[in-house]
């Protein structure tokens, strides 16, 4: 158990009946890069039950934040959803992950393409001042089924632009593009379809993606990663083949292989 920190739950927020977020204490020894994940878990029958979770908070915050789906029969999520303030949670000491700035070649626009709780690492990315130093525009696309699943929308549109240190950069550079597939909404449809048709780019006022200007990170279900990668490939972008070898776009490989 020495490779685990024991943290304490500070707060829990239920977005709807399928999604929730929680904040925990953070051991000062835990250092991570924006976009990375850790293993988190609970002790079940005397043994740690751990799963990979992206860190949704920026690396300078004193707490950790996680964004999770509720799976009624999921071994861990069925328990995590009942967390309350003061409960203990185990967090691995070694963060890792492929969604890191250094593995992207320099570019003008950064697309953060996510569905569901796949937005978690990008919440960390859009709170990192380095993101705005590297790019002229940062486009956060969040695809969900129902409007109630657009977690963090108020934080992204109202709180973050007022950040005392880099709020002006957010106002100038961050484009938030929420998408809903199963009920009426201003942006409707699947992001891959809207990218292929060009509508997504028209809506945000940027040209279609090209390998000279555009970089991307993708996080979502295995099928979403596969389909979105195919669209980026068709635009001429090349994936980073492995950690430490930069490319035009990145996917979180850890979640693909599960």
Curated annotation (Swiss-Prot):
Induction: Increased transcription under iron starvation. The keyword RNA-binding does not apply. The keyword Isomerase does not apply. FAD binds at residues 51-54, 67, 69, 76-77, 117, 255, 257-258. It holds the Pfam family FAD_binding_6. Residues 2-102 form the FAD-binding FR-type domain. Coiled coil: none annotated. Its EC number is 1.18.1.2. It comes from the Bacteria. Keywords: FAD, Flavoprotein, NADP, Nucleotide-binding, Oxidoreductase. Its cofactor is FAD. InterPro entries: Cbr1-like_FAD-bd_dom (IPR008333), FAD-bd_FR_type (IPR017927), Flavoprot_Pyr_Nucl_cyt_Rdtase (IPR001709), FNR_bac (IPR033892), FNR_nucleotide-bd (IPR039261), FNR_type-1 (IPR051930), OxRdtase_FAD/NAD-bd (IPR001433), Riboflavin_synthase-like_b-brl (IPR017938). Gene3D superfamilies: Nucleotide-binding domain of ferredoxin-NADP reductase (FNR) module, Translation factors. It is an enzyme of class 1 (oxidoreductase). It catalyses: 2 reduced [2Fe-2S]-[ferredoxin] + NADP(+) + H(+) = 2 oxidized [2Fe-2S]-[ferredoxin] + NADPH. NADP(+) binds at residues 144-145, 181-182, 190, 223, 227, 255, 257. GO terms for molecular function: ferredoxin-NADP+ reductase activity; nucleotide binding. One of its GO terms (biological process) is cellular response to oxidative stress. FAD and NADP(+) substrate form hydrogen bonds. Monomer. Belongs to the ferredoxin--NADP reductase type 1 family. Transports electrons between ferredoxin and NADPH. Provides electrons to heme oxygenase (pigA) allowing anaerobic heme degradation. Provides electrons necessary to reduce and mobilize Fe(3+) in a heterooligomeric bacterioferritin (BFR) complex to Fe(2+). Reduction of Fe(3+) in a pure FtnA BFR does not require Bfd. Reduction of Fe(3+) in a pure BfrB BFR does require Bfd. This is Ferredoxin--NADP reductase. It comes from Pseudomonas aeruginosa (strain ATCC 15692 / DSM 22644 / CIP 104116 / JCM 14847 / LMG 12228 / 1C / PRS 101 / PAO1).
């Amino acid at each position: 158990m020495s490779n685990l920190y024991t943290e304490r739950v500070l707060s829990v927020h239920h977005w709807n009946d399928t999604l929730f977020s929680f904040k925990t204490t953070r051991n000062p020894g835990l250092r991570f890069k924006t976009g990375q994940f850790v293993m988190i878990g609970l002790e079940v029958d005397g043994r740690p039950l751990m799963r990979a979770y992206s860190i949704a908070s920026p690396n300078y915050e004193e707490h950790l934040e996680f964004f999770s789906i509720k799976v009624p029969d999921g071994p861990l999520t069925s328990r995590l959803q009942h967390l309350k303030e003061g409960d203990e949670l185990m967090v691995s000491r070694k963060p890792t992950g492929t969604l890191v700035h250094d593995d992207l070649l320099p570019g003008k626009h950064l697309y953060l393409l996510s569905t569901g709780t796949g937005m978690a690492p990008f919440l960390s990315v859009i709170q990192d001042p380095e993101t705005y130093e590297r790019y002229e525009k940062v486009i956060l696309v969040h695809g969900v089924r129902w409007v109630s699943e657009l977690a963090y929308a108020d934080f992204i549109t109202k709180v973050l632009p007022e950040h005392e240190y880099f709020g002006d950069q957010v106002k100038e550079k961050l484009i938030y593009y929420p998408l809903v597939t199963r009920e009426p909404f201003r942006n409707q449809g699947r992001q891959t379809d809207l990218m292929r048709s060009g509508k997504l780019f028209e809506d945000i006022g940027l040209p279609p993606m090209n390998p000279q200007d555009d970089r991307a990170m993708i996080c979502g279900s295995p099928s979403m990663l596969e389909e979105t990668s195919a669209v980026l490939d068709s635009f001429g972008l090349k994936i980073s083949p492995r950690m430490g070898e930069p490319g035009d776009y990145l996917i979180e490989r850890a979640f693909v292989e599960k």
